[in-house]
Amino acid sequence: MLLLLLVPLFLRPLGAGGAQTPNVTSEGCQIIHPPWEGGIRYRGLTRDQVKAINFLPVDYEIEYVCRGEREVVGPKVRKCLANGSWTDMDTPSRCVRICSKSYLTLENGKVFLTGGDLPALDGARVDFRCDPDFHLVGSSRSICSQGQWSTPKPHCQVNRTPHSERRAVYIGALFPMSGGWPGGQACQPAVEMALEDVNSRRDILPDYELKLIHHDSKCDPGQATKYLYELLYNDPIKIILMPGCSSVSTLVAEAARMWNLIVLSYGSSSPALSNRQRFPTFFRTHPSATLHNPTRVKLFEKWGWKKIATIQQTTEVFTSTLDDLEERVKEAGIEITFRQSFFSDPAVPVKNLKRQDARIIVGLFYETEARKVFCEVYKERLFGKKYVWFLIGWYADNWFKTYDPSINCTVEEMTEAVEGHITTEIVMLNPANTRSISNMTSQEFVEKLTKRLKRHPEETGGFQEAPLAYDAIWALALALNKTSGGGGRSGVRLEDFNYNNQTITDQIYRAMNSSSFEGVSGHVVFDASGSRMAWTLIEQLQGGSYKKIGYYDSTKDDLSWSKTDKWIGGSPPADQTLVIKTFRFLSQKLFISVSVLSSLGIVLAVVCLSFNIYNSHVRYIQNSQPNLNNLTAVGCSLALAAVFPLGLDGYHIGRSQFPFVCQARLWLLGLGFSLGYGSMFTKIWWVHTVFTKKEEKKEWRKTLEPWKLYATVGLLVGMDILTLAIWQIVDPLHRTIETFAKEEPKEDIDVSILPQLEHCSSKKMNTWLGIFYGYKGLLLLLGIFLAYETKSVSTEKINDHRAVGMAIYNVAVLCLITAPVTMILSSQQDAAFAFASLAIVFSSYITLVVLFVPKMRRLITRGEWQSEAQDTMKTGSSTNNNEEEKSRLLEKENRELEKIIAEKEERVSELRHQLQSRQQIRSRRHPPTPPDPSGGLPRGPSEPPDRLSCDGSRVHLLYK
């Protein structure tokens, strides 16, 4: 029987069972092929996992990577859209060889590009031409082939007038030859080398000669103050100042603006020196400590990380560095989800990182604090294939193996905790074997400088920073060359500079700010704060030792990758647990099983309906109101048919088809309930109305008018149609998604499953549920009451009302039990579907069996196939089948009673005979005649006793 009370419940749990999942998700994009000579990096997935799936979820990003010296031309990253396609599919991505783009520009000249569909591709050709008053030194043409230019890059040299007189320009320098950082030991010889190379060039400052005046600052601000005074107040005038240490540079740069002097440092790294308001004329070829941040951001983008966390030691240098990182990641669309700091004890911050599920962590602290941090990292298990740590690269190579009494972790534990972390370190020597503006490679520079040093390079202070000092002189020379006009163009006279001439200072500042050239330390360029933009070395700890995995040039946004990075999990981890949305679908075995039962039930309903129609002329069938029974069979068929759309979900149908399925469930169940239960309710209502009234009102009510029964059923069906139509028009059912808590898969992968379940719902679902629950619930309760009240009533007009009552009991019980259970289990698709569908199946089966099977059995076993006319002709009587049955029962009972009476009479006769015999014997023993009670009057002849006149003793003897 139908269970419309369960309609809203069936309209909800129609995504279903976890066991049936045809794809990772019902929505997503199909995996695509990489370009030739390239591959695809899948974030958070291993190679085996990629092979096992065909679709990737919406918003998932893939990145193209190329082999060898090739680079991606076209979109590097594609994102899965909601419509199932990847972004920018109309633009192909290719892996091509690209030559250096530095050949596309020529100072004091022009470059003409021909061939190749894009600059610097294989087959591209460049021709070089110099401006007037300059001549070309080198080849005038170069061709790009297999990522290399065919000839070295030429340069334009000024046409110098022979025997021209050159004027001296002085530089005031402070070299720390001793103290905390004795960098002047190697930087001073490097500066002297640069001055020799610059002064020997005919195309740079052809009318001037750079000369150096220097002092030993000892990396002491007090000592530096003394020498600064001497430089400023003693002739000759210095056009620029060159301090070394950060502490000395802070003093010099803050005071230099009062004398309109440009300050160029070669060894200062403090982020505080990037403050343009405080140090308006400061430049440095030594990168700021914040230069690590562009590299970090680039790596975040390379590996597709959008969420990072940070932990820092509370010192000024790390705070300012982290503030800069926060601004940069925000511009790149990356979020710092969690920021922690500590002064001396990192235990609590590390625990907080673990609690917040931090995966990509940037650590800023000194070496001693680094050991404390990673001891806590080991305790919290905040390492392994799910985590990546970014640290500063200037720690000692074995910093994690150094004995430290402040921690309680062993060397083995520390080694395990730090494995795989990434470090960034400033590159102070160009790793590429290319020639700089001085026509020297970095290796040639090292060899030439080593010959000038008095001690071994490892024992010489500032040897690593020496390339920066060398390039500082070249940056100054090129800026002064631009300011003076380069010998052939209009410019200022450098010899006119004095400490009150701000005009020349401003021009030198602008020229210095626009510097861009290839030095022995790499590409030299300054950012808006005057800090050097240099290459960054990227290393990874692999097997307990650091391995170079790449370089990054932030000025060109060029990442040189060696592809030697290794990951514990085989690939870079995700920045968070990868959440894959999956729909819970109904178990197909359950759906098929219930569908088979429902199909058999529909067949049974058709058989019952056919039987009822075929035998509608039989009196016994006629007296059961066959038309109402036919409606019941049709209602059961509709209810059983509703099982099929109840089991349809996203596994079988698309999103656009879901509203139609929702409406099908609603209408099939609604009409099925009205027809099936309404027909039975109408029968039991009429029986109760007619046969439970007072005796004086019965006679005129016993006339059954069928049209009233049909009108009652029509009223119930009409109410349902009206209500369902209003519901569908005003607030139609649509597809909604229920989201459950994340689930961790059994496999040890960094993925969480987000289960979702499809439901049919509407905006005012609770209102409609209240209407249906109230209306149908009252019908069920009233049906139970009427069935109970009429259980002892017997009527020939509706001879199956007791069977109808039994069917109503079953339907009501199943509804009242299944409705609340299904509401509780609405989020468990298999259980909810099983309860709801089986309730429909069982109630329909019971109704059909109770109403129709007894009729079939009676007609088959008793052969009562005659119609009413045939029965009248045969018997000559209008006695109905019910009266004939009663007559036969009474006759049988009468025969049994007659048999019993005959047996009793025979027994009575036998007892009488025995009684007479005893009386005769007694009379012989007592011959005297007793006194005559009649007073001597003669007695008439004795009469035999009446067989029916017995006293109490005889009756007792008779039945003893």
From Swiss-Prot:
Q: Which residues form a coiled coil?
A: 868-924
Looking at the UniProt entry, the stretches that span the membrane are: 591-611, 631-651, 667-687, 710-730, 768-788, 804-824, 833-853
Q: Where is the composition biased (Polar residues)?
A: 867-879
Q: Which UniProt keywords apply?
A: Cell membrane, Cell projection, Coiled coil, Disulfide bond, G-protein coupled receptor, Glycoprotein, Membrane, Phosphoprotein, Postsynaptic cell membrane, Receptor, Repeat, Signal, Sushi, Synapse, Transducer, Transmembrane, Transmembrane helix
Query: In which residues is 4-aminobutanoate bound?
Result: 246, 269, 286, 366, 465
Q: Where is the signal peptide?
A: 1-19
Per UniProt, subcellular location reads as: Cell membrane; Postsynaptic cell membrane; Cell projection, Dendrite
Listed GO cellular component terms? axolemma; cytoplasm; dendritic shaft; dendritic spine; endoplasmic reticulum membrane; extracellular space; G protein-coupled GABA receptor complex; G protein-coupled receptor dimeric complex
Which family is this sequence assigned to? Belongs to the G-protein coupled receptor 3 family. GABA-B receptor subfamily.
Any domain commentary?
Alpha-helical parts of the C-terminal intracellular region mediate heterodimeric interaction with GABBR2. The linker region between the transmembrane domain 3 (TM3) and the transmembrane domain 4 (TM4) probably plays a role in the specificity for G-protein coupling.
| Assembly | Heterodimer of GABBR1 and GABBR2. Homodimers may form, but are inactive. Interacts (via C-terminus) with ATF4 (via leucine zipper domain). Interacts with JAKMIP1. Interacts with KCTD8, KCTD12, KCTD12B and KCTD16; this interaction determines the pharmacology and kinetics of the receptor response, the KCTD proteins markedly accelerating the GABA-B response, although to different extents.
What is the name of this protein? Gamma-aminobutyric acid type B receptor subunit 1
Organism annotation: Mus musculus (Mouse)
